[in-house]
């Protein structure tokens, strides 16, 4: 992979913007790769009706401006480049002349287009869409969301723009001059042809999405545009655009086949780099772009789990058995095991490797002796078991056994969860000191793309590792429990038909 050469004396900082599902984060990275400043704002979630999830695009932009202003107030360093990473699949429509959105963005978790997805399957589109895009037909992806927006919010007119969250923020950062996305985000829309590396005309026609409303597709790494002077007080290059999971993969140094990372957030996402060619999964994993530069494109296999950290939130908000998410660790550790209780976290259906929109959550094995501790432990074990399902599928598709799992995301602070994960997988689990790895990946991409940093391998190797969890004495017991949990998964399948 080709990067610009670093200058002899590097000064300033790289600004990473992480436009996540639950929050907007800005981090400044100094020349050593350390975090020099940071700011965060929570994104309000909008639930118009059951199964629908939306975000206000204007709020996302306002919060972005706030975190940028805050990190600039914390550090006088001049921003040498901007890197951007974002929640993928979430999409919106807006007016080019005014920059005003046509309603809220539809979030990746939103299931309102499930019926359209079923119709596409019934019409025989499953195999063609899989072959072209590497994805399964699911309401998770942008394609059916955009079709819904055009049908229900605003039909096509000259000057209508559409895009994912990266495109929206690039539009705003550049003062409306640039309408673009990168290959990693485009590959998550179910409209991007992996073989031509462009929007697929037949799929656009199928869903009545005009090509002219979509952003131009650019490399993930390298200078894409310049910020409007009103954003920072001066202009700076936007030089790294990556979907959040690809950004984490980049930060972990997973740039070749056999390296796997898992991000534990609201959902969990396991991604393995597969090299310079797309591999079609035989186990219901997604084929996607890892990242690209001006000369090459790397590919990946991904398993998306819809409900992991959200399961812990359900313990707090739904059952009320904990007051904060952090309490889940102590509560689960207060009992030696789950007491035969198993949890299937299909609260929004099942993602990889099942892709069952009709599956529903299941808590089974309850007796009069079951209490809060057993339920909390069953939830943490279920997160580890789900991850095992996907790592097994990755190993089968790639023909390479998993030897180490690199992890990041808010839930990895839970030491019990990480130990359970190591035991269930039977391999070391590596946790870095900086668990905001998506922002770090965006910073690395922007810095390497502008010559702020010169060597990718050295940059990755310099990241401090906080702890490596080794599989322990409960490995065999938990792997036996995994087999029982798989029976519970089968009971949860196709509950809603």
From Swiss-Prot:
The keyword Transferase applies. The keyword Membrane does not apply. Keywords: ATP-binding, Glycerol metabolism, Kinase, Nucleotide-binding, Transferase. It catalyses: glycerol + ATP = sn-glycerol 3-phosphate + ADP + H(+). It comes from the Bacteria. This is Glycerol kinase. One of its GO terms (biological process) is glycerol metabolic process. ATP binds at residues 21-22, 266, 309, 313, 410. Its EC number is 2.7.1.30. Inhibited by fructose 1,6-bisphosphate (FBP). GO terms for cellular component: cytosol. Sn-glycerol 3-phosphate binds at residues 21, 88-89, 140, 244. InterPro entries: ATPase_NBD (IPR043129), Carb_kinase_FGGY (IPR000577), Carb_kinase_FGGY_CS (IPR018483), FGGY_C (IPR018485), FGGY_N (IPR018484), Glycerol_kin (IPR005999). Belongs to the FGGY kinase family. Pathway: Polyol metabolism; glycerol degradation via glycerol kinase pathway; sn-glycerol 3-phosphate from glycerol: step 1/1. It comes from Gloeobacter violaceus (strain ATCC 29082 / PCC 7421). SUPFAM superfamilies: Actin-like ATPase domain (SSF53067). Key enzyme in the regulation of glycerol uptake and metabolism. Catalyzes the phosphorylation of glycerol to yield sn-glycerol 3-phosphate. ADP binds at residues 21, 25, 266, 309, 410, 414. Glycerol binds at residues 88-89, 140, 244-245.
């Amino acid at each position: 992979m080709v990067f610009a050469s670093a200058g002899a004396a590097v000064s300033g900082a790289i600004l990473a913007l992480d436009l996540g599902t639950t929050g907007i984060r800005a981090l400044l990275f100094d020349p050593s790769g350390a975090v020099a400043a940071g700011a965060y704002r929570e994104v309000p979630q909008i639930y118009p009706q059951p199964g629908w999830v939306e975000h206000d695009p204007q709020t996302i932009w306002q919060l972005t401006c706030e975190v940028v202003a805050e990190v600039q107030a914390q550090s006088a360093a001049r921003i040498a480049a901007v890197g951007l990473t974002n929640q993928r699949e979430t999409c919106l429509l807006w007016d080019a002349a005014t920059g005003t959105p046509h309603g809220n963005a539809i979030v990746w978790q939103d299931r309102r287009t499930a019926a359209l997805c079923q119709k596409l399957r019934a019409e025989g589109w499953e195999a063609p869409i899989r072959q072209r895009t590497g994805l399964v037909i699911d309401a998770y992806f942008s394609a059916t969301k955009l079709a819904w927006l055009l049908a229900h919010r605003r039909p096509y007119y000259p000057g209508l723009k559409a895009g994912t969250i990266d495109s929206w923020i690039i539009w705003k950062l550049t003062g409306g001059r640039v309408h673009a996305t990168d290959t990693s985000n485009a590959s998550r829309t179910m409209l991007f042809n992996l073989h031509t590396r462009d929007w697929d005309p037949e799929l656009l026609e199928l869903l009545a999405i005009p090509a002219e409303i979509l952003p131009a597709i650019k490399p993930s790494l390298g200078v894409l545009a310049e910020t409007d002077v009103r954003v920072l007080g001066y202009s700076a290059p936007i030089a790294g655009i990556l979907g959040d999971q690809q950004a984490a993969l980049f930060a972990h140094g997973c740039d070749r086949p056999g390296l796997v990372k898992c991000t534990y957030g609201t959902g969990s996402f396991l991604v393995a780099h597969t090299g310079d060619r797309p591999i079609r999964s035989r186990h219901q994993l997604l084929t996607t772009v890892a990242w690209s530069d001006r000369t090459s494109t790397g590919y990946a296999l991904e398993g998306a789990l819809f409900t992991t950290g959200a399961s812990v939130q359900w313990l707090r908000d739904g059952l009320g058995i904990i007051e904060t998410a952090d309490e889940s660790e102590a509560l689960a550790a207060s009992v030696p095991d789950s007491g035969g209780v198993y949890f299937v976290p299909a609260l929004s259906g099942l993602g990889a490797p099942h892709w069952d929109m009709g599956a529903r959550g299941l808590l089974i094995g309850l007796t009069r002796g079951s209490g809060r501790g057993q339920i909390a432990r069953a939830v943490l074990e279920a997160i580890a078991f789900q991850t095992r399902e996907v790592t097994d599928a990755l190993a089968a598709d790639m023909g390479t056994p998993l030897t180490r799992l690199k992890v990041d995301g808010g839930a990895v602070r839970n030491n019990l969860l990480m130990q359970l994960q190591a035991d269930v997988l039977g391999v070391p689990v590596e946790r870095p000191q900086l668990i905001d790895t998506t922002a770090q990946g965006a910073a690395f991409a922007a810095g390497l793309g502008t010559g702020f940093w010169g060597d990718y391998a050295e940059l990755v190797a310099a990241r401090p590792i906080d702890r490596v969890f080794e599989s322990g004495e409960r490995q065999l017991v938990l792997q036996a429990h995994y087999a029982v949990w798989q029976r519970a998964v089968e009971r949860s399948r196709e509950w809603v038909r």
